């Protein structure tokens, strides 16, 4: 994993300004409220390496975060739980919504270094890591940041769109192919490594993230979905959309329904799966 991760050194931090359709995003919206739902399952794994947190604060902000741990034994579990707890604690220092982008950018570096420095009970390097998706909202504004292959979706007008990218070797291969640095044959020869992560917390030198420096403006009834890869590797976008568009149920019921369907469709192996839903409405 670390060998593949080392390949990302030539990639710099990304601000989402291309490859994402921003045409449907505008500055409309009223001071409505956020409804929350969350669910996490262990799947068929022996242990839970996902960690999540979501809460509303008195200052009007809502914080949502999911980390998907990686590493043998308890390495991934410790990495994800450490990252979530530290982020939640550090977020207490944010007093104004305008501070969020800078906070998130600096926090990712801090979390990366902290997870990289984790040790096991014998003082050996833990060797674990975790992905990160984090969203902060206030009113109809939203900031986010991500590292790894957990996703953030926006559901609007019967459409679903991921607003961040999977930071895996496929992303790098696609870029190299597009720039003429490799041939299609060379691409195919390396495609078996496509899902190896090239960015995650715990690398110790993280430099690839997706984020926004200007607020993403929500419209009434927009839904934000944060999830670990256990969800989208089992359910298609269409299947996810069919479930979350159920306006007759609460976000909590829908979050639980997503994971219930995941397990219903599981025939053999299912990864830990975590989801957080935030609906901006009345």
Positions of the model-derived regions?
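PP2C/PPM-type serine/threonine phosphatase catalytic domain
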Residues: 1-282
């Amino acid at each position: 994993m670390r060998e593949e991760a080392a390949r990302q050194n030539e990639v710099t931090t990304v601000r989402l300004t291309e490859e994402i359709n921003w045409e449907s995003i505008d500055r409309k919206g009223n001071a409505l409220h956020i409804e929350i739902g969350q669910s996490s399952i262990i799947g068929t794994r022996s242990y839970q390496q996902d960690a999540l947190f979501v809460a509303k604060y008195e200052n009007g902000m809502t914080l949502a975060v999911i980390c998907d741990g990686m590493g043998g034994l308890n390495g991934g579990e410790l990495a994800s739980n450490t990252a979530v707890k530290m982020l939640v604690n550090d977020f207490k220092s944010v007093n104004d919504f305008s501070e969020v982008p800078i906070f998130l950018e600096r926090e990712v570096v801090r979390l990366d270094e902290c997870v990289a420095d984790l040790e096991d009970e014998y003082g050996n390097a833990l060797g674990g890591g975790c992905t990160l998706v984090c969203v902060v909202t206030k009113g109809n504004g939203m900031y986010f940041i991500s590292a790894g292959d957990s996703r953030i979706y926006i559901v609007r007008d019967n459409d679903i769109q991921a607003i961040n990218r999977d930071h895996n070797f496929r992303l790098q291969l696609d870029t190299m192919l597009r720039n003429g640095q490799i041939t299609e044959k060379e691409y195919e020869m390396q495609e078996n490594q496509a899902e190896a992560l090239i960015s995650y917390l715990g690398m110790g030198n993280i430099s690839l993230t997706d984020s926004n420096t200007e607020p993403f403006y929500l419209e009434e009834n927009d839904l934000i979905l944060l999830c670990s890869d256990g969800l989208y590797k089992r359910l298609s976008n269409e299947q996810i959309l069919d479930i979350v568009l159920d306006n007759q149920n609460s976000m909590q019921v829908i979050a639980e329904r997503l994971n219930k369907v995941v397990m219903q469709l599981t025939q053999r192996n299912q990864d830990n799966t975590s989801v957080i839903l935030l609906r901006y409405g009345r």
